[in-house]
Every structure is written in structure tokens, then in C-alpha cells.
């Protein structure tokens, strides 16, 4: 690949074919560095400075600002447009890339089909098939600049960039060039907010839900592996909401508890002229969900369920003390941090499986309504109500008692493998079963379960929130102290023989369908 321009820039690595044209009458000294295109082709490890001019043209024509002479490059292949956006109360200078070519412009392996794509830090951009670059915005501080230059100057290493591994090229520059570039960058980016893509490298997808997808990511400086929840795009038309998002995430980042997934960082990122995405950076828990454990084992032992459930209640107690109501407690939102046994002499710290030393419960997705909008969040809950309290379904006022109802459903599922409310147990319908608190402990599934557990569940799955256990009553229940409850379960909640046509399928059985 050959690349040329018509005027040298201080701060760029240059050779006889690496020059730059200024098409504006504005003196070049008045332009400042907005970012760089770093050449990824072996043997062509140079970087092109992209300034804050209104339009930068790329193509084979000698009138282009950046000239690429490969045969698959169009005469006018692409344009970089300076885009100034007010996002999260910051004026951001961004680059909007527009494809003008026949052979395409590709961002991270995907062909650019829309005319409105905002480049992000670390994007890999390929013009045609032959010209491959890594794009980097200029850093917001001299420290960041030095770190970036040091990284790029070091030996080529392999990095994950969303969908593939690429080489980070070797680049060197003189100290005087670095000083000139750094001064220009500081002038432009004095108030530039830190972007998610400044701090993290995105990796593989971990999962997807109603509101967002979750990806793996790595902190560029520390190497820490994290999970990032990327919410679906929304209109950038309400700066008040963006400010509220920032304030609320700052509050949630102060939530620190052993049984809560830590929120580490948050970002608002523009993705087009009119749309933004919100990013939440979270502690990464590697050992799966409570739901997966139930599916794998069909149901959990009583001692195992007790140890996990007490941790769940302890985490909920902390959230409620911080005036945070979860409202979406379910096995998929209960993550497990498992310490594996490395040798037979290690002593177990709980009633776990043979290969496990200890398990720590981590509650995820607390405060989600703050990021999705109250109405959307509630409507989604009502659409999949298996664990939702009756007062949420009726959209009446509610308290932290909604989390105690959901916890009761989880304990029920842990011990028998299927939920107390389901369409399999109808009629009535699933929703009506919840609204009537109509459930039972069916034989033979509950025959060997202690009465004390039935008493606890029956005081959590209470229709009237005022009569439902609060968090302290649940934590102080005799079951946790191995005290048997005598004659405590009402007659209608005794173990009932289920009819053959209503035998429920466990989550394990349903997962095999």
C-alpha cells in the first residue's frame, strides 16, 4: 500500500511519500490534532494526523487530503467530517466518517452502510481491502499522550479488537515532535471527557437482554477484566436525562458490598449525530448464574440453598439500607463467584460440591430502572412476571417488600427445580396465580423438605405487602439457626398431591426441549 499527502506535518512520522495537503486558506498552524490513523500494514507503520478541519478527504485523487494509491481505492473514497456534539453537558469534537466508495469502507470488519458513523477510539478502519488503519482520538492529557506513544513504540503485540486480533504497530517520534503534538492536543482537548474507548478494549459478547448486551472488556492501563453493559441506542435529545444518569451512576458506584456486583464506571457515548449509548462497567463474575446451577443440578440441597439464600438476603438488606429497591430479583440476576478446590487437603467453607471450596453470591442489575426508564422497565417486568410481586403487576405503589416476594420465589425454585407460579399449573393463568398468591407445596417434590422452610416461604409469598416478611424477619427466621418450626404451615399450604395433568417441568427439563 502506498500513501501520500502534499505537505509535511510536525508530530507525524514521515517519509518521502508521507505528506499532507491543506485545502483551506486557513493557516496550518491554526489546525490542531484531533486524532490519528495508525497504519496497520507491516512495513508501513506510520500515522496520519487528522486535524479539526471541517472535512478531511481520503482517496486516490491528488486533491484528497490523504492519498491512498492502491487500485481498490476510489478516487474519492471516504470523508471525515468534524462533528461537534453536546453530550452529557460536554462539547465533544468527534469524527463522522462517510463512505463514498465502490469497494467499501469497513469499521471493525463491518461494511459502513449508513452515512452517519462516529469513529471511536480503537476502531479498525479498512478502506477497500488493502488499506488498514487503527483510529485513535488525541488523548486528553499529556500523561495519556505519553502512555499512548509508549504503547505504540513498544514491540508489536496482539490485541483483541471486538472480532479479531490485530498487531499494534511500532512507531517512533522525536521528543520535540511529541512536545509540539502534546501542546496542540491539550489546546483542543482541555475539557474533553474521557470516553469508554479511551480506557477499555472491548472483547467477546457475554450475553444479551431486553435493554442491553453485555460484553467482556479490559482496562488498558491495569489489565483488569470487566463486564460492560451496553444499553440500546436512544435519542440524544434530553440533556437533563443524561445528567441524571451521570448523577445516579455516581451514587450507585458508591454501593460496596461483598454480595453486590460492583459498578465501576459509566459513560455516555455518541454513536451518530442524533443517538447515544450508555455504558456501565461492572465487576466481572466468571462462574455463572444461580439459574445455570439450578438447571445443571435440577434442584439444590437444603443446606446449599440455605447458604446461598442467606447471602442473597444479606445483599438485599444492604441495598434496602441504601434506599435501593432491586425489583428484578431472579436466578439470572444472581451471579456466583466460586473458589475451586485445588487439592484434597483444602477445607471447605460451606456446604458446597466436592470440587468447590466456597461460593460467594453476587446480586447483579440493581437500579436498572434508572437506566432504562421507569415505564419501559415496569412493562418488561409485567411481560415476564414469574418472579414479580403482585403489586408490581398491578402497577400500584410498592416498597422494598417486592424484593422479599421475589426472594421467596427463588428459594422455592432452588428447592424443587420449578417456580410456584407457571402456566403449567393453570388454570388460572400465571398472572392470576400471582395476583391471588395461589401456590402450593406439591408432593412428592416437597416431602423431604423441612417444615421450617415451608414456613419461611409462606411468609414471603404473601399477597398483602404489609403482612409479608421484611428483610430482618427473613434473616432472623429459625431455619437459618436449624430450629424446626412446629405446626407453622397453614392447612392449604401443606404438601399437596399434584394431579397427573399438572405435573410441572423443572428448569432442567425445559432446557432440554
Curated annotation (Swiss-Prot):
Pfam families: FHA (PF00498), Pkinase (PF00069)
Post-translational modification: Autophosphorylation increases in response to DNA damage.
GO MF terms held by the record: ATP binding; protein kinase activity; protein serine kinase activity; protein serine/threonine kinase activity
GO cellular component entries: nucleus
Residue spans crossing the bilayer: none
Family annotation (InterPro entries): FHA_dom, Kinase-like_dom_sf, Prot_kinase_dom, Protein_kinase_ATP_BS, Ser/Thr_kinase_AS, SMAD_FHA_dom_sf
Modified residues (Phosphoserine): 10, 139
Keyword set, alphabetical order: ATP-binding, DNA damage, Kinase, Nucleotide-binding, Nucleus, Phosphoprotein, Serine/threonine-protein kinase, Transferase
GO biological process, one term: DNA damage checkpoint signaling
Residue ranges occupied by any Protein kinase domain in the UniProt entry: 200-480
Main location: nucleus
Catalytic activity: L-seryl-[protein] + ATP = O-phospho-L-seryl-[protein] + ADP + H(+); L-threonyl-[protein] + ATP = O-phospho-L-threonyl-[protein] + ADP + H(+)
Residue sites binding ATP per the record: 206-214, 229
Enzyme class: transferase
Location(s), subcellular: Nucleus
Known partners and oligomeric status: Interacts with the PAB-dependent poly(A)-nuclease (PAN) complex regulatory subunit PAN3 via its forkhead-associated (FHA) domain.
Family named by the database record: Belongs to the protein kinase superfamily. CAMK Ser/Thr protein kinase family. CHEK2 subfamily.
Name of the protein this chain belongs to: DNA damage response protein kinase DUN1
Species whose genome carries this gene: Saccharomyces cerevisiae (strain ATCC 204508 / S288c) (Baker's yeast)
Amino acid at each position: 500500500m502506498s500513501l501520500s499527502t502534499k505537505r509535511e506535518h510536525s508530530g507525524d512520522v514521515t517519509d518521502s511519500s508521507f505528506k499532507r495537503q491543506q485545502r483551506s486558506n486557513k493557516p496550518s498552524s491554526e489546525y490542531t490534532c484531533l486524532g490519528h490513523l495508525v497504519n496497520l500494514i507491516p512495513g508501513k507503520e506510520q500515522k496520519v494526523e487528522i486535524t479539526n478541519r471541517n472535512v478531511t478527504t481520503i482517496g486516490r485523487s491528488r486533491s484528497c487530503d490523504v492519498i491512498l494509491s492502491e487500485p481498490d481505492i476510489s478516487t474519492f473514497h471516504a470523508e471525515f467530517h468534524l462533528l461537534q456534539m453536546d453530550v452529557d453537558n460536554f462539547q465533544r469534537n468527534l469524527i463522522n466518517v462517510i463512505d463514498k466508495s465502490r469497494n467499501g469502507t469497513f469499521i471493525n470488519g463491518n461494511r459502513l452502510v449508513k452515512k452517519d458513523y462516529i469513529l471511536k477510539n480503537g476502531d479498525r478502519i479498512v478502506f477497500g481491502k488493502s488499506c488498514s488503519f487503527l483510529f485513535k482520538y488525541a488523548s486528553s492529557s499529556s500523561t495519556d499522550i505519553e502512555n499512548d506513544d509508549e504503547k505504540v513504540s513498544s514491540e508489536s503485540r496482539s490485541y483483541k479488537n471486538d472480532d479479531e486480533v490485530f498487531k499494534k504497530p511500532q512507531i517512533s517520534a522525536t521528543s520535540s515532535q511529541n512536545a509540539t503534538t502534546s501542546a496542540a492536543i491539550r489546546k483542543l482537548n482541555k475539557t474533553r471527557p474521557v470516553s469508554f474507548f479511551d480506557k477499555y478494549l472491548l472483547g467477546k459478547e457475554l450475553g444479551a437482554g431486553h435493554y442491553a448486551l453485555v460484553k467482556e472488556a479490559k482496562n488498558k492501563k491495569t489489565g483488569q477484566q470487566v463486564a460492560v453493559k451496553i444499553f440500546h441506542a436512544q435519542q440524544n435529545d434530553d440533556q437533563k436525562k443524561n445528567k441524571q444518569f451521570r448523577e445516579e451512576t455516581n451514587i450507585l458506584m458508591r454501593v460496596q458490598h461483598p454480595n453486590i456486583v460492583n459498578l465501576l464506571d459509566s459513560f455516555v457515548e455518541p454513536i451518530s449525530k442524533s443517538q447515544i449509548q450508555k455504558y456501565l462497567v461492572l465487576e466481572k463474575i466468571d462462574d455463572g448464574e444461580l439459574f445455570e446451577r439450578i438447571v445443571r443440578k435440577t434442584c439444590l440441597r437444603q443446606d446449599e440453598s440455605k447458604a446461598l439464600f442467606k447471602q442473597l438476603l444479606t445483599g438485599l438488606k444492604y441495598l434496602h439500607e441504601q434506599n435501593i429497591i432491586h425489583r428484578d430479583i431472579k436466578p439470572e440476576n444472581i451471579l456466583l463467584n466460586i473458589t475451586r478446590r485445588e487439592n484434597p487437603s483444602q477445607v471447605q467453607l460451606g456446604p458446597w460440591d466436592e470440587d468447590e471450596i466456597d461460593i460467594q453470591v453476587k446480586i447483579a442489575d440493581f437500579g436498572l430502572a434508572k437506566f432504562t426508564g421507569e415505564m419501559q422497565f415496569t412493562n418488561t417486568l409485567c411481560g415476564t412476571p414469574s418472579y414479580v410481586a403482585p403489586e408490581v403487576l398491578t402497577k400500584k405503589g410498592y416498597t422494598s417488600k417486592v424484593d422479599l416476594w421475589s426472594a421467596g420465589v427463588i428459594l422455592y425454585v432452588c428447592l424443587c427445580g420449578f417456580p410456584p407460579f407457571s402456566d403449567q399449573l393453570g388454570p388460572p393463568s400465571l398472572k392470576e396465580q400471582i395476583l391471588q398468591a395461589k401456590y402450593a407445596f406439591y408432593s412428592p417434590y416437597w416431602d423431604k423438605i423441612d417444615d421450617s422452610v415451608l414456613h419461611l416461604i409462606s411468609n414471603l409469598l404473601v399477597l398483602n405487602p404489609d403482612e409479608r416478611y421484611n428483610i430482618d424477619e427473613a434473616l432472623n427466621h429459625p431455619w437459618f439457626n436449624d430450629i424446626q418450626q412446629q405446626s407453622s404451615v397453614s392447612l392449604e399450604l401443606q404438601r399437596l398431591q399434584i394431579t397427573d395433568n399438572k405435573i410441572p417441568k423443572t428448569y432442567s427439563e425445559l432446557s432440554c426441549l
